[in-house]
Design a protein with these regions (language model features):
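Short histidine-centered loop motifs in beta-beta connectors
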Residues: 2-24
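Short, flexible coil/linker segments at or flanking structured domains
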Residues: 3, 9, 36-41, 64-68
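A mature extracytoplasmic/lumenal domain signature
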Residues: 8-11, 34, 52-54
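Conserved protein kinase catalytic core
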Residues: 14, 35-37, 57-60
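Internal, well-ordered interaction modules that form the hydrophobic cores of assembly/scaffold domains
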Residues: 17-19, 25-29, 52-54
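Flexible, gly/ser-rich surface segments that form the specificity/activation loops bordering the active-site cleft
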Residues: 25-45
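Acidic, glycine-rich catalytic/binding loops that coordinate metals and/or anionic ligands
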Residues: 43-127
Length: 127
């Protein structure tokens, strides 16, 4: 089981934990919490904090924080690499194997590259 948690959203999405979503489906808009005031100015800047976990079982606990039973932290970059998921295994890879290419969905709905299984959680403009 793979779980992703998004923070600093403009508003809470109308979905439940464990609910399936389609790749590239808009579930929320990024907000400015965590950057408003101080160094970033009165209005802050829109950004996303992405946390990921994986677990061999589907059970989880959710009160103030989300915790998968038997879960482990997951470097979100591993999702785009296609494995391994364990941080220690990623760290042990030779430098040449640590490169990650991100798949993304454009504002018009096109998946780049075609056939990708996971996309970056922001709509992007191709270069």
């Amino acid at each position: 089981w793979t779980y992703t948690e998004y923070k600093h959203l403009r508003e809470m999405p109308d979905i439940e934990i464990g609910q399936r979503v389609k790749m590239g489906e808009i579930i929320a808009r990024a907000g400015t919490t965590g950057t408003t005031g101080g160094y970033y100015g009165a209005f802050g800047h829109s950004h996303l904090h992405l946390t990921a976990f994986f677990s061999p079982v589907s059970e989880y606990k959710s009160k103030r924080i989300f915790v998968p039973v038997k879960g482990e932290w997951l470097d979100p970059l591993a999702l785009y690499k296609g494995g391994p998921l364990k941080s220690s295994e990623l760290k042990a890879l030779p430098a040449a194997q640590k490169s990650v290419k991100f798949a993304y969905k454009t504002a018009t709905g096109k998946i780049v590259p075609e056939g990708a299984k996971v996309v970056w959680p922001f709509a992007c403009k191709p270069k």
